[in-house]
Amino acid sequence: MENLKTYTFDEAYKASLNYFAGDELAARVWVNKYAMKDSYGNIYECSPEDMHHRLANEIARIEKKYENPMSAEEIFELLDHFRYIIPAGSPMTGIGNDHQVASLSNCFVIGIDGDGDSYGAIMRLDEEQVQLMKRRGGVGHDLSQIRPKGTPVNNSALTSTGLVPFMERYSNSTREVAQDGRRGALMLSVSIKHPDSEAFIDAKMTEGKVTGANVSVKIDDEFMEAAVADKPYTQKFPIDSSNPLVEKQISAKKLWGKIVHNAWKSAEPGVLFWDTIIRESIPDCYADLGFKTVSTNPCGEIPLCPYDSCRLLSVNLYSYVENPFTKEAKFNFELFKKHVAKAQRIMDDIIDLELEKIDLIMSKIENDPQCDDIKHAEYHLWEKIKSKSSKGRRTGVGITAEGDMIAAMGLRYGTQEATDFSVDVHRTLALAAYRSSVEMAKERGAFEIFSAEREANNPFILRMKEADPQLYEDMLKYGRRNIACLTIAPTGTTSLMTQTTSGIEPVFMPVYKRRRKVNPNDADVHVDFVDEVGDSFEEYIVYHKKFLEWMRVNGIDTEKRYTQEEIDALVAQSPYYKATANDVDWLMKVRKQGAIQKWVDHSISVTVNLPNDVDEALVNKLYVEAWRSGCKGCTIYRDGSRSGVMIAVSKKDKKKADKEKEGATDMPVKPLHNVVEVRPKELECDVVRFQNNKEKWVAFVGLLDGYPYEIFTGLQDDEEGIALPKTVTKGKIIKQIEPDGKRRYDFQFENKRGYKTTVEGLSEKFNPEYWNYAKLISGVLRYRMPIDHVIKLVSSLQLKDQSINTWKNGVERALKKYVVDGTEAKGQVCPVCGHETLVYQEGCLICKNCGASRCG
């Protein structure tokens, strides 16, 4: 590899800040997530312009293999400044990046052909899930093949444990896999026909359970009809068997009520209207050839068959509005159609680039030093993925900035007029993408198993035939390059760089406040807030970029420091008024999703945001309307139903808040615990494992009333360390007094058979220096210092020895899981967006501003 120029973070950030016209958040996101880097963190690109040249050159290299190639310059113009076409994160990071051996695919689904109801099959999926996640992919798989709890099995267990233990296994595997500083993404699904579906639905209601996965229930029309009409419904296993091993009748209405309640309470499970998905699915016309859809990717926008994958790309809808925010605003449909055709072509090129990446992955596996027995499973996994990718050539062309497009056209998101316009745009997109796929079939050949006869009665194809008969005739004649083409995904950090609304969603808030820490002694500093430790903060207004554009177009001063009342008045004048995520008419949003879904061959990822005070009846109404409207899935989020998420504040709460103590924030209530001077003889204990300079360590956290009271740490699996089975996660710490009066602490746990095992003398297992620091930390825990303050104290310890610093980090990780969800991480800055908006959630730090997460 040639010696490439490298840049410091500051150099890349400064150049990117200039590129994004001063948008600090966009600049930080790009440098941290998308600039080309090697495994040592060296940065090889100075700004997104470098990245777009890298992408354009690689895509143009593939174009040269085919007729009528696009040039690198033409492709660059489409990508530049994220104006028209934006590949998703994995393609942006991986294309042309020889420093990483990773897939370009955003998402995968895995599964077992035939009988998946065996430990071997379950373990195989666990291994495959991990292997994909380490290459950056999100993974989905279905658990409907696992036999229900209590059914006979031919092993020493005698009866099956059911689905839930395996949900926890797959969830834990996800949490263990690091993908560039974040956890992997996992979707677990199950059919409502399965006798264990109720246990699946309830699994995440237990705090701390299945925290590494999204869960969705595959619901058929028969169940929905039974739930609405309050009729019985039959569950069975195997779910599609005419001669099932297990069969039982349930109240569909009662189980549906549980789905609604859990979604209202915790935003999960999501619902997948499976009959609609299968009925509309073009790939399922080839189900007998391996394209039977079994689950979805983690966000739900791509239903997939086992070992298929998808790469995503978005078209920036705002960029096609001419004279935005004026009476002359017009959508340029002709330019849009041309660009969608090129976007579909670029997506097909990216499939070829992905096949090259898969070859590199397989070559690396072959050359890895491990024995062939170990490497075989991973190698075979990529063989299967390569086969499906080349056979179907599936793409995921989508959109972003729908909310801004609607506002720029002078329409209000959530109205019938705006929905009708959006449907026109998505119909145009679908026809242009399919036209492009047919044209490529002429030039490059159709996907390997194309059959017009198989697809003849597919509802999506029939809609295309009615809308554009000539396109349909050409498809019969030439075929199609791609088995399926379209999706609408959540665009997340990508929309931060387009500086637009995300995906199909409305704007979250057009104007909001942020705080930055300031030195009160500096000149011209305005202190708006002082926290409990005395740090000073200045509040400043952040405008959504396109709202700022509306202000400019209408001659409104964008530099003035406005009062809250003035800001409210400005928003009321704008097309964003009553069109935010929390304002839009919920039923209209669901109906809009259903109307647009008719022109999207995969699915749509969209969330219906609800205020905290809505009841379960509304959630029920929205879900039923989603089913009737033709949605393939539906997700709701009730404000405050999950901790660690940005909470919206209503105006009626504002007056009440203003009267309260200055600086008070809407924080979770921290539990108050009495100080217990005399340690009980026995304490419940959690076991937490971590790495310390490549050594395996274990922490024992003694708990009093469920709250950390003391901590012990030591080496694990060492002759001088602590021998402990990996399955042990809980036990007791027992205080003993020896004959000479010395105190000793023992750890006791129960093995799988219920027998107690005691590890004596925890304190003897420690390096004296570690032991002294552990005693210090235990002291502040004993006197009930809040856990987040203890973590801050531990992190502030100035230790010279690298090994003990690493140990200190492990102690922090062990304690984070006890911080109350939603607690703010005072004084800590998000490494992605640079703002002090981090909160603790399930032991991880989550940024309320940009959604970045950091565990450990």
Where are these regions (language model features)?
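Terminal amphipathic helices with adjacent charged low-complexity linkers/tails
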Residues: I219, E280, C285-G290, N297, ...
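Short, Gly/Pro- and small/polar-rich lid/capping loops
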Residues: Y472-D474, S650-V701
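Function-dense linear segments that define catalytic or interfacial modules
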Residues: M36, E58-K65, L78-N155, L163-F166, ...
